[in-house]
Regions:
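Extracellular/periplasmic helix-loop-helix junction of adjacent transmembrane segments
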Residues: 51-84
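Multi-pass alpha-helical transporter architecture, strongest
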Residues: 217-224, 417-439
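C-terminal transmembrane helical hairpin of 12-TM major facilitator-type secondary transporters
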Residues: 315-362
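Helix-to-loop junctions at the C-terminal end of transmembrane segments
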Residues: 85-98, 301-314
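C-terminal ends and interior cores of transmembrane alpha-helices
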Residues: 107-126, 323-339
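Glycine-rich segments within core transmembrane alpha-helices of 12-TM secondary carriers
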Residues: 165-190, 213, 382-394
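Cytoplasmic membrane-interface "Motif A"-like loop-to-helix N-cap segments
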Residues: 95-107, 311-323
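Extracytoplasmic gate region of multi-pass secondary transporters
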Residues: 48, 248-298, 391-395
Length: 439
């Protein structure tokens, strides 16, 4: 990128000492945004991969389909706690600071995840068991309402305008690393223990082991500095509810930007895996291992998407990626639902690159459309509501649609609907790359 382009965006060149020092802190900024999301999405992934085992332990022994619906219903409950968390923790981020938000969110998530791994079962304490499970999921969802978007805001505000997409993609990368670790851990537990032992107690291992992420994340975030935009927003102490009404347009735009990608992600990398594992228990380890390997494709696609969006423009790329996903989702889902293990891998791989690239650039794009005064609160609320509807409900809706229509390919139309809505919302938008973040 030329110095003239840097001047156009109001930035310094790489020869400036201040800019050089800022670039040296980019790694710490990226790690601070990444680590909390590793923990948060490790838990969400593990819960999805052990859904059938958790259902056996925490719900009455009704039909397998009913247990799966109940388990995925609790999975969705965590997402619906996110909007509440986004308002409370978002207000912390806007009125106190981004650093305080990130420290608080990782502590809440880490403690709730640890407790989930220690809960007594339905056979031990009856109906109190699913109620406690629901409570832990609510706390986790509450914390995630501030964590994901808070870290996106932090990394974007800390980065150069020329590198916002690339640096903020670290937050998105953290989610995939968490999914990879969750998928890999699920495969390792299933490969190391007999199926009855996994069902009885083995599923608890990942939740208890996640305490390592909690400790590392807390120590890392304790040493980060506040962003200049965070200090400015805290000094203004913006009002809460009036700001949500004032920010209605970027809230709607956020839905259009992220809905399809997240619906596709959760169907592809959570629901499809769990369905194949449930229908073919003897091949469960194969599908988990395949899922883990394909997630590496998503991981490496995220910084690529962020980097390209810095060069080409985020709106243009998101429109193109939505069209790609609309074009391949039906064929991809057919491979995931009906194919051999190799067909399953090919189906996931068709979706992996466009999903990864879209997730890598969405963070910076959404941060850029919100005003400074209420950026964390309004953005967190918009993102959380969208993920609750499009992402959190995706496994539940997919399970219901397949059960109702007796057609495993119906979820493709569910994803396509979000894609068409996204195209309609993003088409009239202007490019976001060059927008100043202190406005």
């Amino acid at each position: 990128m030329t110095d003239s382009r840097a001047a156009e965006l109001g930035t310094k060149t790489t020869h400036d000492p201040e800019t050089a020092a800022s670039q040296q802190s980019a790694l710490r900024t990226a790690l601070a945004g990444l680590i909390g999301n590793v923990l948060e999405w490790f838990d969400f992934a593990v819960y999805g991969y052990f859904a059938s085992d958790i259902g056996h332990q925490f719900f009455p022994q009704n039909s397998a389909a009913a247990q799966q619906l109940l388990t995925f219903g609790v999975f969705a409950l965590g997402f619906f706690a996110r909007p509440v968390g986004s308002l409370v923790l978002g207000a912390v981020g806007d009125r106190i600071g981004r650093r305080a938000l990130l420290t608080l969110s990782i502590m809440l998530m880490g403690c709730a995840t640890l407790m989930l791994g220690l809960l007594p079962t339905y056979a031990q304490i009856g109906v109190a068991a699913p109620l406690l499970l629901m409570l832990m999921r609510v706390i986790q969802g509450f914390s995630l309402g501030g964590e994901f978007t808070g870290s996106m805001v932090y990394t974007t505000e800390k980065s150069s305008p020329l590198m916002r997409g690339l640096v903020s993609s670290s937050t998105a990368a953290g989610t995939t690393i968490g999914f990879i670790l969750g998928s890999g851990t699920a495969w390792l537990v299933n490969a190391s223990l007999p199926a009855d032992q996994v069902d009885l107690w083995g599923w608890r291992i990942p939740f208890v082991g996640s305490v390592v992420f909690l400790i590392v994340g807390y120590l890392l975030r304790r040493g980060i500095s506040e962003t200049a935009e965070g200090l400015k927003a805290a000094a203004a102490r913006p009002p809460l509810l009036p700001s949500l009404f004032a920010d209605w347009l970027p809230i709607v735009q956020t839905f259009g930007i992220v809905a399809m990608t997240n619906a596709a992600y959760y169907v592809t990398f959570t629901y499809a895996v769990e369905r194949r594992k449930t229908l073919a228990p003897t091949d469960g380890q194969v599908f988990l291992l395949a899922n883990t390997l394909v997630l590496f494709v998503v991981l490496f696609s995220k910084p690529l998407g962020g980097w390209l969006s810095d060069k080409l423009g985020r709106r243009k790329m998101m429109l193109g990626l939505n069209v790609v996903m609309l074009s391949v989702i039906y064929v991809a889902l057919k491979g995931m639902m009906f194919g051999s293990p190799m067909g399953f891998v090919l189906g996931q791989s068709l979706m992996a690159v466009p999903i990864g690239m879209a997730l890598g650039l969405q963070g910076a794009m959404v941060v850029e459309i919100f005003p400074l005064r209420t950026r964390v609160t309004s953005m967190s609320f918009a993102y959380s509501v969208t993920l609750a509807l499009a992402g959190g409900l995706a496994p539940f809706v997919s399970s219901w649609l397949i059960d109702h229509f007796a057609n495993p390919l119906v979820p493709a139309y569910y994803i396509m609907a979000y894609g068409l809505i996204g195209l309609a919302i993003m088409w009239p938008m202007s490019e976001t790359n060059a927008r100043a973040l202190d406005r």
